[in-house]
Regions:
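Transmembrane helix-loop-helix hairpins at membrane boundaries of multipass inner-membrane proteins
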Residues: 1-88, 160-179, 205, 236-238, ...
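Alpha-helical transmembrane segments and their helix-start/interface "positive-inside/aromatic belt" motifs
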Residues: 2-14, 136-145, 340-349, 422-437, ...
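Hydrophobic alpha-helical membrane-insertion segments
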Residues: 10-24, 147-156, 350-357, 431-449, ...
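Membrane-helix interface motif
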Residues: 24-35, 157-168, 358-371, 444-463, ...
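Short aromatic-rich membrane-water interface segments that cap or initiate transmembrane helices
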Residues: 39-57, 174-187, 374-386, 467-475, ...
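Hydrophobic transmembrane alpha-helices and their helix-loop junctions in integral membrane proteins
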Residues: 68-109, 119-415, 419-424, 560, ...
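Membrane-interface and transmembrane segments of multi-pass membrane proteins
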Residues: 423-557, 670, 686-698
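Flexible extramembrane loops and terminal tails that flank transmembrane helices
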Residues: 563, 574-583, 589-595, 649-748
């Protein structure tokens, strides 16, 4: 069996088995399961998995949709040159996604969050020979990974202010967080991370570009998993920030804008995958809008729509890949020319598009009714209902247009595309068909299957025992009338699509407001130009300039840190003893002689004087072992310099720039800053858990009384080994350079 099939089927088995476990947990009435694996208390870092109701829903979609994607990939990637790397990256991405939704510790969530961005970058750039693919991958990485920094800062601030390093601890400190002066800042940081990950306005430009990735990648990452992480984060934080006014304003504004703008962009687009990308952004905006409303109706609608969108969008992306690769139909116009779709392709496409429209008896119909009910029962019912009709009308029009392009009778004059035999292979349509059938099952058996899965998550979010009450049919009510009006509006848009897309107002909106890619490219270009200017200014090629800049920056940092110390007082400064002053004077004298010496011998002996002063300092500090080591090092260095000095030109010891007033000032500044900070640190030195651990455990665990040596050779032996290894590699590198450099007489 080929390695491709072994990998694909292996991931199918693993993800299916994990999905069955999460499904079993979803049907149990148990509370959240917390599995602690390892923790490092000083940094508030803990590897712990929190498997609760909402984590079950997310993990279930990741596992089972992922299994179907790998099944689809086994056929789609058969002739792909980099299929092994794509499949392995997809597998790593799947497990990083699982870690993200199951992790409880905020720092662990951040690590997994950024891993998904890195794997997404690698998967998008599989065809890295193309410039547009590289730009798409870079756009994805910069926006999503950059947004993840907001999550990191949120974690740091929550640990600093409240000692809360996990979602469960944040919920415990809910009242303190809301009353804290930095509560709005924490919410803005979380929103920044969520909006960038879920491609919300104004960070939505990366997702349409990511369609440069192969279809299995788009079907998995950009429909049901990675792009929903932002929504996942908002759901996790809903019990904490959901009652804040800023939450409602921010999420309703950004979600509503994304919902509408992306819907219009999808309606204008011609490429199938681009249409699906924009409708994904629109759907994510709708979820954010529902969470922003924050009512029990909207939370229920968001949870149900989360499942609906994952089912139909991943199915459509798989079918779009089939059409583009094997039918050569990646645009609406080319799709209209294909006349011989297989029955399974047509059926899968009809089911997916019906879910996108929201037709009965699919779960999507229940979801649409809930969305309308949520807007009708909101505070701004008229505005939000109008927004829902207009934005959803554009998205529904896209579904009707794609469906009509596939199903409408073909004109005989048109050239028919021959259907590749590979595209009839069932594994290309079977996964999409399964997802469509699941949409029907979840709709028809909503109260028997869907409601038990979602009920506990719903209760936890709204903190109430209100029934979920998922019914397929609620009768002819006002919500049904709004749904009908939306469908009529969408049909009108689909019929007159070509005329509407040519209107000047649509074109001007696309040019000025909707095209975020141009603004992103502008920012990246200007930033690159700024970096070039900075590089040309700072990277002069002179070592003296580099040393000056680094020393000035270091001195400023040290000086500011010392002066702004909370307990700053001249009384806190501990001055050195007389013996230490002798060592310091030897070091200073040797340094001054080196700077002013014009002979090789004088410079070398002065350098030895500096080493002698350092040895005196070690002896005065009762560090005899360090003093002995220093003597050995200085002796060896002195011998080496004596041999090298014969070939060193005399001009190397000339005074030059090193004795200038600027150099002297910088040297004094950096020395004074180091000395001042060191004396302050000695005064304010506090015992930590780490230092106490080394002091108490050096004898019982490492059988050594010299704590410094024990740390180097026992507790941190791998660090020491790594340092030794680095020095050996550096020595080998220097030896290689010496051998390849032409030897000139009299010069080294």
């Amino acid at each position: 069996m080929p390695l491709t099939l072994i990998l694909c089927y292996g991931f199918v088995i693993i993800l299916t088995a994990l999905g069955c476990i999460f499904l079993a947990l979803a049907f149990t009435d148990s509370t959240a399961l917390l599995i602690k694996i390892w923790q490092f208390e000083p940094l508030h870092f803990e590897i712990a998995l929190r498997i609760d109701s909402f984590a079950n829903i997310c993990a279930l979609s990741i596992c089972w949709i992922g299994a179907l994607i790998f099944l689809y990939s086994s056929s789609y990637l058969k002739s792909y040159s980099r299929r092994i790397s794509v499949i392995c990256m997809l597998g790593l991405f799947a497990f990083s996604m699982l870690l993200t939704v199951l992790a409880d510790n905020l720092i662990l969530v951040f690590i997994a969050w950024e891993l998904t961005s890195i794997f997404s970058y690698a998967l998008i750039s599989t065809e890295r020979e193309k410039p547009e693919v590289r730009m798409a991958a870079l756009s994805s990485l910069l926006i999503t990974a950059g947004g993840g920094l907001g999550l990191l800062i949120l974690a740091i601030l929550s640990i600093t202010f409240f000692g809360a390093a996990s979602f469960s601890e944040l919920e415990f400190y809910k009242d303190q967080i809301i009353a804290h002066p930095w509560s709005h800042t924490l919410l803005l940081l979380a929103s920044f991370a969520a909006f960038s990950k879920s491609a919300q306005f104004p960070f939505s430009s990366w997702l349409p570009r990511a369609m440069a990735a192969p279809s299995p990648v788009s079907a998995y990452l950009h429909s049901a998993t990675m792009v929903t992480l932002g929504v996942y984060l908002l759901v996790r934080l809903f019990p904490i920030f959901g009652s804040m006014e800023l939450w409602t304003i921010l999420l309703c504004t950004i979600g509503g804008l994304s919902f509408l703008v992306a819907g219009i962009r999808a309606f204008i687009a011609e490429k199938i995958k681009t249409i699906l990308a924009h409708t994904t952004v629109s759907a994510l905006g709708l979820m954010v809008l529902m969470l922003g409303i924050g009512s029990p109706y909207s939370v229920k609608a968001a949870l149900v729509f989360y499942i609906v969108h994952a089912l139909y969008k991943s199915s459509l992306f798989m079918l779009a890949g089939d059409f583009a690769k094997f039918q050569k139909s990646n645009t609406l116009q080319k799709l209209e020319e294909v006349d011989n779709f297989s029955f399974s392709s047509k059926l899968a496409c009809i089911l997916a598009l019906a879910a996108m429209v929201g037709l009965p008896p699919l779960l999507a119909f229940i979801s649409k009714e809930l969305l309308i009910e949520a807007t009708l029962n909101s505070k701004s019912a008229l505005l939000l209902t109008a927004l829902l009709i207009i934005a959803n009308g554009f998205v529904t029009a896209c579904a009707l247009t794609i469906g009509w392009s596939i199903l409408k009778p073909k004109k005989k004059k048109r050239k028919k595309h021959s259907l590749s035999p590979v595209s009839n292979f069932s594994l290309l349509t079977f996964p999409a068909l399964i997802l469509g059938i699941l949409g029907i099952i979840f709709g028809v058996l909503a109260q028997e299957i869907t409601e038990p899965i979602l009920a506990e998550a719903y209760f936890n979010l709204i903190a109430s025992d209100k029934e979920l009450d998922l019914k397929l049919w609620h009768g002819f009510n006002f919500a049904f009338a709004v749904s009908t009006a939306t469908l009529v509006f969408a049909a009108f848009l689909a019929i007159y699509r070509k005329s509407i897309t040519k209107l000047k107002i649509i074109l001007s909106l696309e040019e000025l407001f909707l095209n975020g890619q141009k603004y992103f490219d502008f920012v990246v270009y200007r930033f690159s130009a700024l970096c070039k200017i900075a590089t040309s200014y700072f990277q002069t090629g002179k070592l003296t300039d580099y040393l000056v800049l680094n020393f000035i920056a270091l001195a400023c940092v040290l000086a500011v840190g010392a002066v702004t110390h909370s307990n700053f007082d001249m009384k806190n400064i501990i001055f050195p003893s007389e013996a230490l002053l002798i060592g310091a004077l030897l070091i200073i004298a040797g340094s001054v002689i080196i700077l002013n010496s014009d002979s090789r011998a004088g410079g070398i002996l002065s350098l030895a004087l500096v080493g002698l002063g350092t040895t005196v300092v070690f002896v005065c500090s009762s560090a005899i072992d360090l003093a002995l080591t220093q003597i050995l090092v200085e002796t060896l260095t002195l011998v080496i310099f004596v041999f090298i000095a014969i070939k060193v030109p005399k001009k190397y010891f000339s005074i030059g720039a090193s004795s200038s007033a600027v150099s002297h000032f910088i040297a004094l500044l950096i020395g004074a800053s180091f000395a001042f900070l060191h004396m302050m640190a000695l005064r304010s030195q506090e015992s930590t858990e780490i230092s106490e651990y080394y002091l108490t455990q050096s004898i019982p665990q490492a059988f050594g009384g010299n704590v410094v040596n024990v740390i180097l050779v026992d507790f941190r032996s791998f660090d020491t080994f790594g340092e030794v290894l680095v020095l050996c590699i550096a020595a080998l590198g220097v030896l290689a350079l010496i051998r390849i450099i032409p030897q000139h007489k009299g010069n080294l």
